Amino acid sequence: MIQTESYLDVADNSGARRVMCIKVLGGSHRRYAAVGDIIKVTVKEAIPRGKVKKGQVLKAVVVRTKKGVRRQDGSLIKFDDNAAVLLNNQDAPIGTRIFGPVTRELRGEKFMKIISLAPEVL
């Protein structure tokens, strides 16, 4: 459950290390984002010579949350961190590698690229 001012780790090799959510996209009064939701983020920590710089404002998709994902069969999948993958304006991932597991809930037309790059899909 990600809201405005939440910090997230970056799960790709775009050059950012930590980002902060500044807006949850999808409605004027939408408060929380879960796995698979697109948010607007600002880069708070970045490595030198990366594709993105500190202070840049980008889109991101949430791939892991501490809150977890409830499945239809009643099981709950939780993670140790909140993580996101940075996107460009066309909703394609900026990085070329994904670190850590992602959930099956990302399957769909938009995020199949992230699923194919991920080392593990839960």
Curated annotation (Swiss-Prot):
It comes from the Bacteria. It holds the Pfam family Ribosomal_L14. Keywords: Ribonucleoprotein, Ribosomal protein, RNA-binding, rRNA-binding. The keyword Glycoprotein does not apply. PROSITE patterns: RIBOSOMAL_L14 (PS00049). GO terms for molecular function: large ribosomal subunit rRNA binding; structural constituent of ribosome. GO terms for biological process: translation. CDD domains: Ribosomal_uL14 (cd00337). One of its GO terms (cellular component) is cytosolic large ribosomal subunit. Binds to 23S rRNA. Forms part of two intersubunit bridges in the 70S ribosome. Belongs to the universal ribosomal protein uL14 family. Part of the 50S ribosomal subunit. Forms a cluster with proteins L3 and L19. In the 70S ribosome, L14 and L19 interact and together make contacts with the 16S rRNA in bridges B5 and B8. This is Large ribosomal subunit protein uL14.
